[in-house]
Structure formats: C-alpha cells, structure tokens
Amino acid sequence: SLDTSNLIAEEVAQDKPAEVENLEEIPTTDELMQNPDVREQPVADSDDSDLTVVSSGAYWTIYRNTANGEYSMRMFGNVPSSRPTAWNSYLKSIKHIEIEEATLTGSFASYFRNNVFTVLESVRIERSNLSGVTSFEMAFYSPTLQKVIIRDNDYPTAPSLRTTEYMFGYTHKLTELDVSGLDASAVTNMNCMFNYCSVLEELDVSNFDTSSVTTMRDMFGSSGKLEKLDVSNFDTSSVTTMQAMFYGCTSLEELDVSNFDTNSVTNMSYMFYNCAGLEELDVSNFDTSSVTNMYGTFVGCNSLEELDVSNFDTSSVTTMQAMFNACRALEKLDVSNFDTSSVTTMQAMFENCTGLGELDVSNFDTSSVTTMAYMFDGCTSLEELDLSNFDTSSVTTMAYMFQNCTALKSLYLDNFTTPKTMTGMFTGTTALTYLFASHNLRAFDGLANTRWYDEKNWVQFSNYKELQMYHEYQREPTGYRKGIFLSLTMDAMGGQFEEMEEQKVQNKVSGEYWEEMLPVKEGHYFDGWYLDQNFTNKFDFSLPATVSATIYAKWVENYTVIIPASISLNEASELKVEGINRGSKTLSVGLNYEETTISESNKLTLSNTADTTVQCLAPLSWDGSETNPKNAILTLAPGSEITEG
C-alpha cells in the first residue's frame, strides 16, 4: 500500500460538488402503488407486453413493468433541458431511461443525478441530435448508475458542448460505458469527467477530439479498475492543467502519453499518482517549460523500472514535493540536469525509492528551498549521496531527511547549515561509515551512537555526544569515520627519522597497510623493525593493519679495519683481504679509495665468498676465537666496482 503519511495535503478536487437545485419530496414506489391518481394504463406503443404506461407527455413516456415492478422512461422528439413537474411522483422509482431519435437542447447539467433520479441504473442516448447540448456537467453524477450508452448520435450542426466536468463523476457502480457517440470537439473543460468510476474496467476514448480542452484535472482520477485506456491520440496542445489526470488508476498496465503536447501545461501535480500497475511510462518528450507544480507527479508508481525525465525543463517549477515518492522499482533516475533554482519544497521528493542504487543531485540549486524533510527517507539501496553543493541557508526543516537510508555509506554535507528542525535527520543510517559535514551544521540528530573519529586530526570519540561536542568547535568542514582507528608507533631506538624525530606515529583504518620508514643512526646499520626489544619477532609490513602496535628499530654497530695499501691490479690478478674476528661483534669489511686512483675502464666490485650479492660494507661474521679462528676472505675481482663505505 502507498504510504502518504508524510505528504502535506494539497487539494486534488476530489470533493463532491454542491447540489444544483432543491427538489420537493418525491414519493417512493410503494406510495405510487397506492395512489389512485397515478395508476398505470396498459401501454399501446410498446412491444413489451409487461410494460404499461403510467404517465406521458409531449416528449416522454413513463412505464411500469408489471413483471418486476420496475419503472422506466423513454424520451423522444424535442427534449428540453428542464424537467416537468409531472415527473416528480416517479423520480424515486425510475430505474432506466432511454432517449432515442430525439433532439436535445440546452444545458443538461446534473440532469440524471442521483439527487433527482435516486435509483437510476441505466441511461441510453442513441440516434439523437446532440448539437444543441451546451453542458453535460455532472449529468450522470450518480452512485447508482450501472450502465450509460451514448452512441450513434448526430451532430448536424457544430456541437455546442463546452463542459463535461464531473459528467460521470462518482459513478461507483458503473460497469458499462459507451461514449462513442459523444462529440467533444468543442469541450474546454473535462475536469473529473470520469472521476471515481471505481469499478469500470473498460473505457474507449480513443476517438475523442480534445483539441479545445484547456483543463483535464482529475479526468480519470480514482478509476482504479481501468485496465486499458487509449489516450494516444489526445490533442493536448491547449491544456493548461493535468493535475491528478490519472490519479489512482492502479490497474493500468499500459499508458501511452508519448505524443502529449504539454507546452501549455502549468500543473502536473499528482498526474500519475499511485498508477501502481504501470511498468513503462514514456514522458521523455514532455515539454515542461511552463510547469510550476510537480507535487507528487509520479508518487506511488511503484512498478516503474525506468523513467526518463532527463530532458525535463524544470526552470519554472516551485514544488517538487513527493515527486518520485514510492517509485520503488526504479533503479536509476537521471535528474542531473534539473534546474531547481525556483523550487521551494523538496519534502519527501525521493522518499521510499527503495530500488535506487545511485542518485546524482550534485547540481541541484537549493538556494530557495525551505523544506527538505523526508527528502531521502527510505531510500534503502542508496550507498552514497553527494550533497556537497547544496545551499541550505533557506531551509527550515530537515526532519527525517535521511531516515532509514540503511545502505548509505558515505554522505557529503559540505555546505549545510543548521535548520530550525532536524528531528531524526540521520535515524536509521546504520551503514553510514563516512560523514563529511560543514562546520555550520551543529547537530547530527539520530546518528548512530557509536565510536567515530576525525579522519584528519585522528581524534577518537567513544560516542555520538562526544562527536557532536567536538564538531561544535570546528571552523572548517570536517570528515568523520565510524569505528576505531589504529596506530603504529615506530621507535627509532636511538636513531632518527628524516625530520630528526626519534619516534614516528602513523594511523590507519583496519585493513589498510602500514608504510615502512627507515631511520638512521651514526656508526650503525639498520637491521629491521621488531615487535619486541629483544628483536626476536620481526614486524611484517606486507600484512594489513589489524591492531595498534609499537615496533622497535634494530641496529648493528659498525667496526672498521683499516689496511693502508696501494693496490694495482691487472686483468689476471686479484686482491684478497683476510680478517680474524677475535670478539663477539659483527665485522664489516669495506674499501676506501681515492676517486682518481680508480680507472673508469677497470672498475671493481666488492664480492664476498659467502654471499656474492653483498656489495661494499658487506657484513662478515666470525664465530671463532683466538684458539679456534675462522677466516673470512673478501675477494676483489677484476672488473669490479668499488663504492665508498
């Protein structure tokens, strides 16, 4: 069912019109039977032997069916729009009216209404001249009518019919309607013409000439059983309002309005309200340049999977309230070109668009908007909303604006200001992990009461109140992330980093990777990061961050053995340096040289018999002692490169 509880009421012209005339108390059928003055006489001009004439006049005859006791009336000849007083005794009894081979003249407004013919069930107008009829306004406005046939009629002169407003309004029991014999070419007003034809399943208006019509407000409104409706040939070039035109046509599965000329239309509010059965609707050619009101235009079209409004000119629109409310099946909606500079209300605009996975409103001009309450309420598939360009300086209420956006992960509110009302603004945003908010937005009502942190300054908050208090003191837009951030403290253990710090602290979110930083220490070389100061558990930077930790730099002291020598090598010779470690320290062996003594064509490479990949200052270790020395030999081969160490 359609939830419209958050919509502000707007008149859709559903109220019943006032009575048009006062009638004297009319006797019932039982009273007629006991009134000797109106006893029926056998009918002479009928083929039905059960019918007897009870009263007649110049253009009418009233019958009673002796088999079932029902009263009926037949009209013919020149039929005026007035009702003779002779009918008064039968108005509460006549169930069927037939008008054949007649000429009708004047206004037949409210002619067959239920406050006149209180039990009327059927009306048939056939083979008659209707050129002189000026009005059928509310003519068949009756909850008792079940069948109306208007067909095979003549228009020897130009039709005079100007209004069919409420012509079949509130015909709750009407199951059969034929208007093929109605010439509507001169009609200007079709407001509510078929309003509340609640059980009517078929209606053929495919041949209607609507070229003169200026208003179609609520024309088919609340005709919830209509399964087919062909309006593809409607000429709507003169129409100024289509408000609620198809309001509540819940059973329509197809509706072709692709040829509608909407150049003059100013009001499209509720136009397709609750057309819940429509799976397709082509409005891509609509000219909406004159439209000012799009209140609830597509509200409740919950079967529409696609809706192309990308070419809508919305420069004149002042209200978009509930425009797409409850379009539950829509997965995409392109409103990126909407000109919203004149819009004052966007309340519930996308409420309950549960299928929308993405929505680009980044270009919306919201400088004139005063209400954004419920704007995205119930958009359960949206994961990100960029409202960074929204100007909310005129907004007074954002109540429940993002309520139950349960999939929303990121929200950008760069330019938001604090409105008068923001009750429940973030209620139900359970998946929200990132919020970038203006420093002028002072509260986050309904935000998850859990841990958050300032992503820039790495300040941790244990609950929502701490976050809000912190944000009140910010002087620039700030980004907040849900959860706990992790810290890695890197202790240089006597060494230093580039900026002379002895410690470095980096912060990451769980799952991210730590950055390895290398300190330096004079007289030592760096031998890695460890999780303990005994250097038994080496830290692995290839693993994602899962916990906060402190790591320690391991240093190895350098010892230098100086061997003064002048070295001259040819291609066949080599230099060997032997050393004996008589202690427990690691021995590094290097070669210092004067740049001018090394030929560019005969460079040397320092190699190690134990590890040929080690160059220069290659660490050599001995486990021996004076009684059990172990020699390590450093070999300089021809063609090797020596680097200073």
Which ranges hold each PLM region?
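N-terminal capping/linker segments that flank leucine-rich repeat
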Residues: 2-132, 146-161, 179-183, 413-417, ...
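Structural signature of tandem-repeat unit edges
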Residues: 70-78, 92-104, 117-134, 143-162, ...
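Structural beta-strand segments of beta-rich domains
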Residues: 71, 571-575
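Serine/threonine-rich, repeat-prone extracellular segments and beta-strand-based repeat modules
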Residues: 464-480, 531-552, 626, 633-637
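Secondary-structure capping and domain/repeat boundary segments
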Residues: 484-559
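Solvent-exposed, conformationally flexible loop/turn segments
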Residues: 500-514, 546-548, 564-572, 609-613, ...
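Asparagine-centered strand-capping/turn motif at beta-strand->loop junctions
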Residues: 579-583, 608
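Short acidic, flexible loop segments centered on an aromatic residue
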Residues: 589-598, 618
